[in-house]
Amino acid sequence: MRHLLLLFLCPCAIGVAFHLWLFNFSGLFTWFPVWSQRSYDIVVGVLSARHNHELRNVIRHTWLQHLKQHSSLSQRILVKFIIGSHGCDIPVEDREDPYSCKLLNITNPTFKQEIESFSIPDIAALLTEHHVVNVNFRVLYPVVITRLGVFQHDSAAGFHRNITVKLFQTEHEEALFSARFSPASSGVQVNGIWYKPVEQFILPEGFEGTVVWESHDPEGLLSGNVHRVIVNDGGGIFRITTVKEGLLPYEFTEGVEGIAGGFTYTIHEGEALLNTLETRPERIQIHLAALEKEDALLQEESTTFQDIVFVHVVDTYRNVPSKLLNFYQWTAEFTSFEFLLKTDDDCFIDIENVLEKIAHKQLQKENTWWGNFRLNWAVDRTGKWQELEYLSPAYPAFACGSGYVISQDIVQWLASNSQRLKTYQGEDVSMGIWMSAIGPSRYQDSHWLCEKKCEAGMLSSPQYTPQELLELWQQKERCGNPCACEDR
């Protein structure tokens, strides 16, 4: 009897264990049983931010509803929204930038006085052969630069060098301001650094700058290694960025990395910063409560519509490439399909037109990438699309993110190599870099629009509000043209 009981219980235990394994696979919350797989013509992956409920609902009530109402289409197409399973637990006001989830870690800032950016122990400063030295920095809270300075040995009486100091906005060829030091015009010496005043500018949060020291004498500069200099960052107001941290030299950078002087600065609107820091604990508590509510709403939304794949990443802009790779893993593991269409939740998609064109173009089911490709797109070294870890000045060809189609074998390759593929600043350029390794057949089609505009016959168009998406669909339903209907 005991053996008979085990015979019945073991399959159940194995089934439960298998269910739990599926539930936890790669951190994906959506369970898609292997034994109920259906073969689809297209899997549509819609990248969506956690808070974009309205955009998802508009899609559900427009073209996605249209698919479900047509049995032939619903059997051929599977649509899933791709959402990060975790929200950033830091309020936007307390992050280094709105694109990542890094705490703006400012502590004990110095207000209402000039701060010397660098000081250097005697043993750390050496007369070098380098005539041009530079250092890069990033502003994390607005500052005002007041003076530029240059090192000189304490033992020297007076200033006997000819040196120019310039401060650039990174990747710009023209200096914002500069100071020229000479025996006849040496400025004022403070703590071993000679300073001269400069025109005062507010350097905003996120500003990326480069200070360049240039010697006009036969001998080189007195300079120190950036890792041996004392950085007076005002409690975290700015940060030195170095090549040794894995970042590339900027295109217009002159000379070698080092510090041959400094600058003085004041914190702009210190009272506002103090208020931000004092109210941070309360703000974080409110934010965490809102995250819990958002989690509950997303789980309810997922249960109701059964169209969300939660991927195990913190849902921020910088993590979008990882979101996509995680979705490719899920798709390769739990679905059977011929093509995958990737789009965003703010895009208009004409899915029937996509199907018709696949048939008309007779797209191959292997090694195929169909989209609107950007060629020789310059790599940005600053700003939202900053990329410091891709060596070339231009990206490989990549399809606009509003919509593109890839064949099943490419998805399988991406999924199989997802743990080794490096992610870059955007999912579209990351895809171009990844695909350069395997060289798929690219099918160029300008009907995948890269910018927000409406054209007859378009396959996709990006950057719409929920109301605009609804209006486009209503016009398509009314007269077949989402852009305009002629009144009769």
UniProtKB/Swiss-Prot annotation:
Topology, Cytoplasmic side: 1-2
Transmembrane segments: 3-23
Alphabetized InterPro entries for the sequence: Glyco_trans_31
Reactions listed under catalytic activity: 3-O-(N-acetyl-beta-D-glucosaminyl-(1->4)-alpha-D-mannosyl)-L-threonyl-[protein] + UDP-N-acetyl-alpha-D-galactosamine = 3-O-[beta-D-GalNAc-(1->3)-beta-D-GlcNAc-(1->4)-alpha-D-Man]-L-Thr-[protein] + UDP + H(+)
GO molecular function terms attached to this record: acetylgalactosaminyltransferase activity
Glycosylated residues (UniProt): N24, N105, N162
GO cellular component: a single term: Golgi membrane
Membrane topology label: Single-pass type II membrane protein
Family of the protein in this entry: Belongs to the glycosyltransferase 31 family.
Protein name: UDP-GalNAc:beta-1,3-N-acetylgalactosaminyltransferase 2
